[in-house]
Amino acid sequence: MPEKPQATHSEFGEVLGTEKAITIWQAISDLPQVGIGEKVGIFDYDKLAEFAYQVWSREGSKNVENHTTQNHSQRVLEKISSVPMGEGMKVFIDKYEENKVTYCGGYRRAKKHIPSYTVYWTRGMTSIHPEENRFLSPRECARIQSFPDYFIFKGTTIENYTQICNAVPPLLAKAFGCYIIKVLTGAEINPIPWQFSSRDNHQNYRGKVDSKSEDNNFPIQLKLPF
């Protein structure tokens, strides 16, 4: 019987003898700010990457695509704006009296400094952006799922959400694959393309990770499909 794989990252990091898990803010904070109802969804990188995961996500991509957002009705905007960080629709459910018993997992606003909730697309909604009063864009969901920016999703925004949120995260799939290879052959393969850690900070990368630079030749171990 194969041994259980050893954890490499956790929310509590050094307390458990692991690297600290990547937070949602470390995954998406370098993406361009986008307004409600953005339909084109193609942007230049207008910020420098501050964390290793952002550096890895940008490798091989000259711009940001699939960064589209939905138009929200005034009623939906009222709901979104009423949800504080780390909470969900339970904060307003008595007011709107909907899905009171059957579904209470929607309208969740992610906390910035912990790993993201599982990305989902259901009933026309996904998680709320930590700071902005809108749902996450498909590209933000893709970052959370560990799709690099060069991976472009085709179809409508709704189809993009469905593709991304129903997918097995690529880095998770790679970790499974590497462990299966280890069990079958004994070969050790590091599934982590970068030593991602919440201890990373902008001092490590500022000034040398602008993806528009021709000198940006960071290593990458994940190419899709694989």
What are these regions (language model features)?
Residues 1-42:
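Flexible, glycine-/basic-rich loop-and-beta segments that form/coincide
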Residues 33-226:
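C-terminal target-recognition/interaction regions appended to catalytic cores
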